[in-house]
């Protein structure tokens, strides 16, 4: 996700070399952290507005993308409520939404369904499947093998920081 500089090999993101053009690489990456990265005193709408402005999305376009995001995650009716009143699953959905506002080509997701209700989990799965069908590359970390089986067309198993196996589900 460009936080740590590579020490060997090559990384190209959306046609940009990470070492030579990290800014354009970053513009094409979305990151969903395991910890919720929202302001509890803000509404969902205001959180999306804040993060969208950080991506420098112009006003009218940003408002349209916020409305699309709220609709995608089924939170339009609660858009003006403070995030602190949301369930864990609702917070997760908005958290993912903040990483999608700038329409990245690659999305890194770290344990996006930890500790949430089944309805939110299924909605997140549906969104991930829709994004993938739309051409987005998703790097998904999980400890839940059934999630990897459902969502991933390639799987890597990491132990002590090293990839010990990788391939399709059938290959593994």
Q: What are these language model-derived features?
A:
Residues 49, 53, 60-78:
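Conserved ABC ATPase "signature" region
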Residues 107-110:
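Catalytic Walker B motif of ABC-type/P-loop ATPase nucleotide-binding domains
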Residues 103:
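Conserved catalytic motifs of ABC-family nucleotide-binding domains
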Residues 9-17, 25:
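Conserved ABC transporter NBD signature motif
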Residues 166-167:
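ABC ATPase "signature
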């Amino acid at each position: 996700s460009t936080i740590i500089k590579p020490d060997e090999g090559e990384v190209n993101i959306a046609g940009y070399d990470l070492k030579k053009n990290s800014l354009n690489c970053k513009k094409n990456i979305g990151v969903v952290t395991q910890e919720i990265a929202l302001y509890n005193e803000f509404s969902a709408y205001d959180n999306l507005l804040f993060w969208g402005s950080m991506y420098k999305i112009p006003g009218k376009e940003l408002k349209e993308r916020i409305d699309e995001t709220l609709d995608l995650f089924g939170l339009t009716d609660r858009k003006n409520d403070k995030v602190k009143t949301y369930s864990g699953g609702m917070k997760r959905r908005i958290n993912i939404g903040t990483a999608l506002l700038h329409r990245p080509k690659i999305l890194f997701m770290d344990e996006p369904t930890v500790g949430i209700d089944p309805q939110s989990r299924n909605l997140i799965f549906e969104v991930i499947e829709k994004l993938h069908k739309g051409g987005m590359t998703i790097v998904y970390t999980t400890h839940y093998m059934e999630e990897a089986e459902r969502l991933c067309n390639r799987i890597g198993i990491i132990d002590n920081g090293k990839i010990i196996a990788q391939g399709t589900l059938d290959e593994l």
